[in-house]
């Protein structure tokens, strides 16, 4: 017999869980978590777009660096999406939802040089890194704040690496 059931709350529907975080805290935390999931889905896709399409000086170094970034972004995305579900929410990670809700500007498909890609990536990594850092203090759930802190450390490092390669 399944113990999963929907529990009506004031602002949303949560899936039953024995996690005793306050329902209002769960609901607001899930909104913040999903905001970051959406940003990370977009950032992972953008990173791969740049990885595939750049050419020029320092190509191989940046190409390989971006693979590592994308792997880490996907790991954080997975952890954050799973936290949504742990709190009784539904993780919003589809391309359709991401397209509708991402704060990131559309990534240009008409750039080719390593430098142009690095500049475009720096703008987008900066937005996500700053938003994740802001989310740490927005949430009232310590476990979620800890998850965001881990992601923030990596995103700040990745932004630093990208900016350090811009000539």
UniProtKB/Swiss-Prot annotation:
The keyword Acetylation does not apply. Its EC number is 1.16.-.-. It comes from the Bacteria. One of its GO terms (biological process) is chromosome condensation. One of its GO terms (molecular function) is oxidoreductase activity, acting on metal ions. Keywords: Cytoplasm, DNA condensation, DNA-binding, Iron, Iron storage, Metal-binding, Oxidoreductase. Fe cation binds at residues 51, 78, 82. GO terms for cellular component: cytoplasm. It is an enzyme of class 1 (oxidoreductase). InterPro entries: DPS_DNA-bd, DPS_DNA-bd_CS, Dps_gammaproteobac, Ferritin-like, Ferritin-like_SF, Ferritin_DPS_dom. The keyword DNA-binding applies. It catalyses: 2 Fe(2+) + H2O2 + 2 H(+) = 2 Fe(3+) + 2 H2O. It is found in: Cytoplasm. Belongs to the Dps family. Homododecamer. The 12 subunits form a hollow sphere into which the mineral iron core of up to 500 Fe(3+) can be deposited. During stationary phase, binds the chromosome non-specifically, forming a highly ordered and stable dps-DNA co-crystal within which chromosomal DNA is condensed and protected from diverse damages. It protects DNA from oxidative damage by sequestering intracellular Fe(2+) ion and storing it in the form of Fe(3+) oxyhydroxide mineral, which can be released after reduction. One hydrogen peroxide oxidizes two Fe(2+) ions, which prevents hydroxyl radical production by the Fenton reaction. This is DNA protection during starvation protein. It comes from Sodalis glossinidius (strain morsitans). The gene is dps.
């Amino acid at each position: 017999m399944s113990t999963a059931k929907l529990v009506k709350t004031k602002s949303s529907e949560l899936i039953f869980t024995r996690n005793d975080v306050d329902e209002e805290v769960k609901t607001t935390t899930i909104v913040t978590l999903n905001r970051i999931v959406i940003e990370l889905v977009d950032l992972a896709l953008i990173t791969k777009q740049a990885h595939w399409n750049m050419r020029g000086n320092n190509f191989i170094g940046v190409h390989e660096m971006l693979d590592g970034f994308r792997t880490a972004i996907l790991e954080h995305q997975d952890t954050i999406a799973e936290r949504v579900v742990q709190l009784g929410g539904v993780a919003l990670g589809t391309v359709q939802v991401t397209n509708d809700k991402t704060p990131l500007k559309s990534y240009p498909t008409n750039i080719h040089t390593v430098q142009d890609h690095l500049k475009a990536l720096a703008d987008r990594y900066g937005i996500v890194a700053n938003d994740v850092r802001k989310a740490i203090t927005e949430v009232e759930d310590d476990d979620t704040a800890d998850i965001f802190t881990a992601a923030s450390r990596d995103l700040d490092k990745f932004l630093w690496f990208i900016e350090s390669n811009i000539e």
